[in-house]
């Protein structure tokens, strides 16, 4: 089944409400559309955008429970290699009400602790347990990926910021925080690229 993407329509919709919630809703608006493919043995598997929306919601409910109501609005680091669950991991954190700090998945325990302290973060979603201050909440990604379905009536509360850091190899690394409006502005910049080369997206 052929799918088309209305770049102009989506861009205009995003301009109407430049929030992470609206960006997520627009991204997942064609729920039946394939979003990602991977191989399990010889079998081709896929997630649709509807699948990713639901997984994001499931992860959000799990993270809200693990990280706590009182920590909503604060930063939580994501320290995870690229994988098929990365999309719902990121959006699940945002939908749970926590701002996302993106960290290099290969940082040492010492540098991970340093970056968490610099960002005022309350925890980290990680592929391995770190030897860091016990005051930080550590959520293992393998546990998150097994999260049960979100309970009926669970309502996401979207956060509004994403933080990136320069190479975390020295103690002088810097953290840059992007409010949701700035994130949406960056997304809208892709419209200019599409105008220059329409083959980027099948329109």
Question: Each predicted region: which residue ranges?
Answer:
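Conserved AMP-binding A3 loop
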Residues: 46-49, 161-188
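A general structural motif
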Residues: 33, 71-73, 121, 157-161, ...
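Conserved AMP-binding/adenylate-forming core of the ANL superfamily
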Residues: 12, 35-68, 77, 81-83, ...
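A short N-terminal helical cap/helix-turn-helix that marks the beginning
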Residues: 12-36, 161
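Conserved AMP-binding/adenylate-forming
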Residues: 45, 62-106, 203
């Amino acid at each position: 089944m052929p799918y088309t993407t209305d770049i102009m329509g989506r861009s205009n919709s995003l301009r109407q409400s430049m929030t992470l919630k609206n960006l997520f809703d627009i991204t997942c608006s064609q729920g039946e559309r394939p979003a990602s493919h991977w191989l399990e043995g010889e079998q081709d598997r896929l997630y649709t955008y509807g699948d990713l929306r639901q997984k994001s919601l499931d992860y959000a409910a799990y993270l809200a429970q693990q990280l706590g109501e009182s920590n909503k609005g604060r930063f939580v680091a994501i320290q995870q290699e690229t994988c098929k669950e990365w999309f719902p991991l990121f959006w699940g954190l945002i939908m749970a009400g926590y701002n996302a700090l993106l960290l290099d998945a290969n940082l040492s325990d010492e540098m991970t602790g340093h970056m968490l302290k610099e960002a005022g973060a309350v925890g980290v979603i990680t592929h391995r347990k770190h030897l860091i201050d016990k005051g930080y909440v550590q959520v293992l990604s393998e546990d998150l990926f097994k999260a049960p379905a979100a309970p009926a009536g669970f309502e996401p509360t979207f956060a509004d910021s994403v933080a990136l850091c320069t190479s975390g190899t020295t103690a002088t690394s810097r953290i840059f925080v992007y409010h949701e409006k700035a994130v949406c502005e960056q997304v809208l910049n892709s419209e200019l690229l599409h105008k220059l080369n329409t083959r980027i997206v099948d329109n």
